[in-house]
Amino acid sequence: MEEQTKEIQEEKKETPQEEVREEKKEEKKVSVIELIQHFSDIPVEVEVVVGRANKTLGELLAMGIGSVIEIDREPKDLVDIKVNGKLIAKGELVIIDGKIGVKIKEVVKEQR
């Protein structure tokens, strides 16, 4: 019985191949900061959504210069800020040097 126990314990020891795999895993560990720095130059599309409106094709065809499309938001409502189509924040429209900008007011937590 004692011999069987020794055999089982010896079987549990890592083989040389398993030791190499463990060493490679250690080499591959990269800090989150290094990972972010590595990918920080990747371009992403930032989209600001002021509002939406549903119209029929007939209503769209009847529109022309000067037509007004009413959207689903009040002037005081925050706008949606999306990155690559995903809602990440809400903000307020502001004017900066004669151009429109968005001031972030809320960060949207990821929904799971």
From Swiss-Prot:
GO terms for molecular function: cytoskeletal motor activity. Gene3D superfamilies: SpoA-like. Its main location: membrane. It is found in: Cell inner membrane; Bacterial flagellum basal body. GO terms for cellular component: bacterial-type flagellum basal body; plasma membrane. GO terms for biological process: bacterial-type flagellum-dependent cell motility; chemotaxis. Belongs to the FliN/MopA/SpaO family. FliM is one of 2 proteins (FliG, FliN) that might form a switch complex that is proposed to be located at the base of the basal body. This complex interacts with the CheY and CheZ chemotaxis proteins, in addition to contacting components of the motor that determine the direction of flagellar rotation (Potential). This is Flagellar motor switch protein FliN. It comes from Aquifex aeolicus (strain VF5).
